[in-house]
Amino acid sequence: MAANKERTFIAIKPDGVQRGLMGDIIKRFEQKGFRLVAMKFLQASQDLLRQHYIDLKDRPFYPGLVEYMNSGPVLAMVWEGLNVVKTGRVMLGETNPADSKPGTIRGDLCIQVGRNIIHGSDSVDSANKEIALWFKDEELVEYKSCAYEWVYEN
């Protein structure tokens, strides 16, 4: 996959949905120059959430995390672009909003770690696993944005 074809999984959590922050978050990724290739709005099942957070299953907060993520709808997305995993994480800010810089999503829009409004893949490998877990291949849309030439040099 070409460098500008890297993909990441981003999910707006139930608190972000309930607070009406979906449009602002999508706008930030679009304005950065990333391309949305898949999106679905769903009530994630506990089974899906347990699989998604399997690496955290032995942590004391795991049951509460699954319950919180299951408490309302989630907006699951796949974004594509140059270094989108790393840059996406920078855009999100630190997991704990109190440690996030102004200008980041968490730094601007939330206060507590337990309500940090958004998830983003932490590595290319994690992104690939998360995308495969949440989306079927045929749900990933291939298209060339007319803005492509204005975002990338070549």
From Swiss-Prot:
Gene Ontology cellular-component annotations: cytoplasm
Q: What is the E.C. number?
A: 2.7.4.6
Main location per the UniProt record: cytoplasm
Q: Where does ATP bind?
A: K13, F61, R89, T95, R106, N116
Which Pfam families does the record associate with it?
NDK (PF00334)
Q: Does the keyword Magnesium apply?
A: yes
Active site (UniProt): H119
Annotated catalysed reactions: a 2'-deoxyribonucleoside 5'-diphosphate + ATP = a 2'-deoxyribonucleoside 5'-triphosphate + ADP; a ribonucleoside 5'-diphosphate + ATP = a ribonucleoside 5'-triphosphate + ADP
Q: Name one GO biological process term.
A: CTP biosynthetic process
- To which protein family does this belong? Belongs to the NDK family.
Designated name of the protein:
Nucleoside diphosphate kinase A2
State the species of origin: Xenopus laevis
